[in-house]
Amino acid sequence: MRGKKRKTVCKAKGKLTSKSCMCTKANARYTCNCFSKTLPFNEKAIKCTIPEKINSEINISKSEMLLKADKYTNAIYKHSKLRKIFKAVKENLSTTNFATKSKGIVHSNFNDSKPIHSPEIKNYTDFNCDFMHPCGLCSPKNFLSEVYKLLRFYNSTVVQIQVYSRNGLLVNSLHEKLMEIANLIVNKGEQTVSETFFHEQKTAIAINRFLRGTVPHTELTRKEAMMPVNVNSKHRKNSGVYSLYINAPTEKDLFCAAHLCVQFSIRYPADILLNVSKLTQPLLLKEHLIIYNTFNRYIYWDDYGKLLKT
């Protein structure tokens, strides 16, 4: 006993271009199950033809895409975005200087590995402004940009400028210049290092699990995480690095101090390292409380809108 022919439905969505779909035969006419249209029957034709519609695209279902999808071959990879990213990474690795003499090989998952030999680097002792990249992490431009962004969103009392140098005379000279700027709070001193000690693997895993929350915060896990590693306090030493921590009650004073530090950094790029940090609590002395309130009253308390129009 013959059964009825299975209806073949075109799994298309949306508008189509000139496309043929299989339909069922009924009363000498084709009934198009895809588009709910009845078209004249043609004995020689096996399919019904759908008129072309301009500015339309074919949306194939996921099942058809899986059946007709080609494998991700090297030819496809050659023109893909992933290939461009991989090329950029290889070029970056080939031009980046990480060591004095290094030979690195970058391997590809598509059998396209080539050895990359990085050029030798000379150990520079005399640095100048030309050696430092203008947009690098330690550049004065990047430092001022970070100070500017912090002062846009935070009050000056929670922003701190940090200066580090091994040249004590240079730090003293910068400290004297900073004292010529009004309303500054400057901490100066030499860094002290406690006794060095290698942690065990158990200690590293315990603190990592505690901070990530992968273990319950019980008394035992809290004790393992918070218990300090005791060393001999007499085995301390001075690192030879002098630091300046600069704070100010107003944005005006702190920004002037930042520009002064940048001037010293441009003049002595190999001797000064600048940094900026955001504090958790404001640092404001009682001597600066009236200055702080007066300065902020001009901005927040008075009619600031009228002052902007003038």
Curated annotation (Swiss-Prot):
<protein>
    <recommendedName>
        <fullName>Protein U84</fullName>
    </recommendedName>
</protein>
<dbReference type="InterPro" id="IPR005028">
    <property type="entry name" value="Herpes_IE2_3"/>
</dbReference>
<dbReference type="Pfam" id="PF03361">
    <property type="entry name" value="Herpes_IE2_3"/>
</dbReference>
<comment type="similarity">
    <text>Belongs to the herpesviridae U84 family.</text>
</comment>
<dbReference type="GO" id="GO:0006355">
    <property type="term" value="P:regulation of DNA-templated transcription"/>
</dbReference>
